[in-house]
Amino acid sequence: MAGPPALPPPETAAAATTAAAAASSSAASPHYQEWILDTIDSLRSRKARPDLERICRMVRRRHGPEPERTRAELEKLIQQRAVLRVSYKGSISYRNAARVQPPRRGATPPAPPRAPRGGPAAAAAPPPTPAPPPPPAPVAAAAAPARAPRAAAAAAAATAPPSPGPAQPGPRAQRAAPLAAPPPAPAAPPAAAPPAGPRRAPPPAAAVAARESPLPPPPQPPAPPQQQQQPPPPPPPQQPQPPPEGGAARAGGPARPVSLREVVRYLGGSSGAGGRLTRGRVQGLLEEEAAARGRLERTRLGALALPRGDRPGRAPPAASARAARNKRAGEERVLEKEEEEEEEEDDEDDDDDVVSEGSEVPESDRPAGAQHHQLNGGERGPQTAKERAKEWSLCGPHPGQEEGRGPAAGSGTRQVFSMAALSKEGGSASSTTGPDSPSPVPLPPGKPALPGADGTPFGCPAGRKEKPADPVEWTVMDVVEYFTEAGFPEQATAFQEQEIDGKSLLLMQRTDVLTGLSIRLGPALKIYEHHIKVLQQGHFEDDDPEGFLG
């Protein structure tokens, strides 16, 4: 369009540069502007820092002007904000302002480099009257009504040189080509550009209104967290529908996130009784419900685990949870999925919350179903590793070893279930569910308790084969049982998660225990100094290392 007329008359451009230099020192010559901007862009594309010396040298080599003139024109471009001066690590370089859009505030100031480019029609109007400079300024200002006054002033200054009216859009149009913007089109994008920051896609006519009132849109994104914390009026009509058909809702149709208050309402708890709803309280209610239905069993620390029959002996917890979920459907599947996920994430964090929940609900309400399931030993499959660990940890101390030791590991205040509810084998140990049943499980006459490496007894439940005397032959569960009896039940689960058997235990270094198991420093030091180190010394003094390592 306006590009071809700019090239033929070179004397017009020369007259324009002299007139610009004489009349207004603040406006840079379009040829110089194009040369300097192209030089900066080419230097940046070659990853060379466009400092003053490089720019002057390259402009002189390509086009011939002296460095002093290039320096003066560069200063004018900096005043027009077409070039930015950047100081980085003590050295000053220059950047093309049209390429630097993100740092500008609110996405409005990219208008200055675009202003003359977006208004070729406005610049084409003044050729009949080239002499007076005032007419182009109001035309340019009218072409960009929604821009900042500084941008309008820069556009007016850029269109101020009188004679090259048609010649001005030429270099701008040529420079617009590498920027991938056709000359006639960009009249609309600058108007739509400012609202792109705060708004998604408003109509161009509402650009000014969008800039004046940016406050109403932002409160919409944080609405879901508020919906989870305090009950707004809309959810109650939707609330009764998801829980009864939880499985169907997950099978087909989009899943809607369930708030904590809806879960509490569905489980029958009083939502506003205890003040603010926390995740721990809701998890406690979920555990009550699952334990009452007999779907989950409560362990000694108050956490819930799948029944023994639903979990293979050595399968990882994720696989056992998946197998259990495949067996169930409907709301029990939803409850158990939530329970498994929350138990894996927050087992240790929410331990105190679970115990407090257990103290709120009477003890007689919960163990009835759980004891019934636990005492029917015939219904269950093989005993899992985790349950065996909990079972061993709850056995009473051996009568011969009772003196000189502190309270047993299972005698802490966190024990929620009674001892009678945790005697797992159906006919092996005779224990009643009454309140005065003896807590230590009696040993069968043919199996005396053998002291371990540190003097702790093993032989607690009937029918279980004893732990080998040599630590090399210990399985993962023997290691877990050893540390549980030694008074470190929480740390024993870390050994179980890492699947550390006797051989690995004897090879552990001090740093492995302190940093590799994700357990606290105090218990880790005690475990290493008083147990692992003692076992290693005893083993390597008794046995030869070749036989162990082989």
UniProtKB/Swiss-Prot annotation:
Domain notes: Winged-helix (WH) domain directly recognizes and binds unmethylated CpG-containing DNA via simultaneous interactions with both the major and the minor groove of DNA.
Gene3D superfamilies linked: Transcription Factor, Ets-1
Modified sites of kind Phosphoserine: 163, 270
Subunit structure: Homopolymerize into a closed pentameric ring. Interacts (via SAM domain) with L3MBTL3 (via SAM domain); the interaction mediates L3MBTL3 binding to chromatin. Interacts (via WH domain) with KDM1A; the interaction modulates KDM1A function.
Gene behind the chain: SAMD1
Biased composition (Pro residues): 1-11, 125-138, 180-205, 214-245, 437-448
Localization in the cell: Nucleus; Chromosome; Secreted
Skewed-composition ranges (Acidic residues): 337-355
Keyword Hydrolase: no
Species in which this protein is naturally found: Oryctolagus cuniculus
GO cellular component: a single term: extracellular space
Biased composition (Basic and acidic residues): 290-300
Name of the protein this chain belongs to: Atherin
Major localization listed first in the record, in broad terms: nucleus
InterPro entries xrefs: SAM (IPR001660), SAM/pointed_sf (IPR013761), SAMD1-like_SHD (IPR056983), SAMD1-like_WH (IPR048589)
Disordered, as annotated region: 1-32, 93-468
Start and end residues of each SAM domain: 474-542
